[in-house]
Structures are given as structure tokens and as C-alpha cells.
Amino acid sequence: MATTKRVLYVGGLAEEVDDKVLHAAFIPFGDITDIQIPLDYETEKHRGFAFVEFELAEDAAAAIDNMNESELFGRTIRVNLAKPMRIKEGSSRPVWSDDDWLKKFSGKTLEENKEEEGSEPPKAETQEGEPAAKKARSNPQVYMDIKIGNKPAGRIQMLLRSDVVPMTAENFRCLCTHEKGFGFKGSSFHRIIPQFMCQGGDFTNHNGTGGKSIYGKKFDDENFILKHTGPGLLSMANSGPNTNGSQFFLTCDKTDWLDGKHVVFGEVTEGLDVLRQIEARGSKDGKPKQKVIIADCGEYV
């Protein structure tokens, strides 16, 4: 059945994880129709795994590519297709009652990550310890003038880390300047999830299915040196490994489960208040409550 391609098993969950956390972690890949977290009725805590059902099979596949063996609350999680069974009373909703299967896969959850996330240096210093002043001189800075509804909301200024990810930074810079004949001007932030991220960059289809890079095709993940350590970080959206185009997102909070899956290539240096205005137009399912447009964009020279 098609449902089996849309439902994911997620194992290795920390005690702190609930349906809201899972929704925030998996919603970037597509619309979610259901989340189930089976409970241990003796302890009244969840059993360390959950099931996430997507509207579309391709979205579920993208979630597996991005989230399997990623980190969530300090633990490495396991994500794969679930094995559903149907409720006998005529319902089409799967029920996760195959305990032998659950024991088999929930037993394979990986150990808690040994490295403390809190030991990371602040993003302004970065992992390489390069002074901020030197980075500001050597790396390009770009801007986006944002319009919410029909009113100007302000400017977001971003530093692009060409010293760490030159290919990714150059792609974004050129899409801001339109020097290749196409780019972000006039496009929208099509997916906005409060306390998570604001995603844009689809200037062809305007719905998250399009966009293109300056290289004429999807390009590879350059590296994962920079991390999703807090709000205001600029990172590439993708549909799996090595599928970078033009879509990007700005973080509204720490999103460390995306580390190693999405390439961070810049940070907001001015206009975090504008990002918060964009964030306020979001919703749990990612659909903006109000149109958010990149009215103009370019490079500081």
C-alpha cells in the first residue's frame, strides 16, 4: 500500500522528545498528517521511538535521507520506513502493534552522542577561531530588503562564509546580485515555522519545488564544518544529500539535528529583528499567514 511509503519509524529518542519536537524536526520535508509516540504504560513515558506519517511518499523519502543518523536532543536517531498493519474495523489508519518488529528496530537505536553540544564556541568565533574582523574583510556581505504584505519590513544583512564554503557562498552571492540573469528578487519565503526556520529561494515555482543554482544543476554538499548553533544562521535547504540548488533557510533557533545534513554558509549580521517579523508570519505547518517577499537584494561592495 502507498501508506507504507509515507510512514517513518523514528528510533533512539531522548526522554525530552515529544510530538511538538518531532513535528518541528520533520515538517521541513513536507506536510505531516500524523505523529504517534507509543507509551510504556508502566512508566508513563514513551518507549524511545515514534511514527511520523507524511502526506507524500517523496517527502518521507527526503526525511529519511536528511534525518537518519542525525542528532536530536544529544542522541543519534534512526529513521527508516515503518511496517504498518491495518486496523480490522475498516479503518485505513495503520496501527503499530507488531511488537516483535518494534523490539527489533527500537533495540538498534544508537548510543547517546559522547560530545557535548554545549562545548561548541559561539557562532561569532566559529569552529576555526578566525577573528570576526578578518572574516568581515575577506568574506562577501549581502542584503535582502523584505516586504511583508504590502509594507516594507526592513533589511537583513548577511555575511557569507566563502572562507569555509566558497562554492556555496558564491552561489548565494550571485543569486542576490542577479549577475547571472536570475535570482532571489521578487521571490517569497514559502515555508515559515516559528522557533525553527524561515525558508525561501524558490524563484521558479514559488512553492518549494523549484529554484536553480548558478551552476546549472544541483551541486554537492561542500562540507559541514559550520553548525546550526543558534538563530540567524544561513543554511542550504535540500531534498537529500548533494541536492543543493537555490533554496535556503534562516534559523530562528538552535537546530542542531540538521548538522551534517544541511550546509551552513553564512549568518545574519544586521536585521535579526526583521527575521523575527518574518518568523511571526509563520505557522506550525509552515504556511505563511501573510506574503513575505524579497523586494530587493544585492551585495555590499
Curated annotation (Swiss-Prot):
Modified residue annotations for Phosphoserine: 91, 97, 119
Reactions this protein catalyses: [protein]-peptidylproline (omega=180) = [protein]-peptidylproline (omega=0)
Family matches, as SUPFAM superfamilies: Cyclophilin-like, RNA-binding domain, RBD
Gene Ontology MF terms in the entry: cyclosporin A binding; mRNA binding; peptidyl-prolyl cis-trans isomerase activity; poly(A) binding
SMART domains, alphabetized: RRM (SM00360)
Compartments where located: Nucleus
Domain remark text: The RRM domain mediates both interaction with RNA and with KMT2A (via the third PHD-type zinc-finger), but has much higher affinity for the KMT2A PHD-type zinc-finger.
Protein name: Peptidyl-prolyl cis-trans isomerase E
GO terms under cellular component: mitochondrion; nucleus; U2-type catalytic step 2 spliceosome
Subunit structure, interactors included: Identified in the spliceosome C complex. Component of the XAB2 complex, a multimeric protein complex composed of XAB2, PRPF19, AQR, ZNF830, ISY1, and PPIE. Identified in a pentameric intron-binding (IB) complex composed of AQR, XAB2, ISY1, ZNF830 and PPIE that is incorporated into the spliceosome as a preassembled complex. The IB complex does not contain PRPF19. Interacts (via RNA-binding domain) with KMT2A (via the third PHD-type zinc-finger).
Organism: Pongo abelii (Sumatran orangutan)
Region (Disordered): 107-140
EC class name: isomerase
Annotated Pfam families: Pro_isomerase, RRM_1
Annotated EC: 5.2.1.8
Family: Belongs to the cyclophilin-type PPIase family. PPIase E subfamily.
GO biological process, one term: mRNA splicing, via spliceosome
Task performed by this protein: Involved in pre-mRNA splicing as component of the spliceosome. Combines RNA-binding and PPIase activities. Binds mRNA and has a preference for single-stranded RNA molecules with poly-A and poly-U stretches, suggesting it binds to the poly(A)-region in the 3'-UTR of mRNA molecules. Catalyzes the cis-trans isomerization of proline imidic peptide bonds in proteins. Inhibits KMT2A activity; this requires proline isomerase activity.
Residue span(s) of domain PPIase cyclophilin-type: 143-299
Keyword annotations from UniProtKB, A to Z: Isomerase, mRNA processing, mRNA splicing, Nucleus, Phosphoprotein, RNA-binding, Rotamase, Spliceosome
Keyword DNA repair among UniProt keywords: no
Domain RRM: 5-83
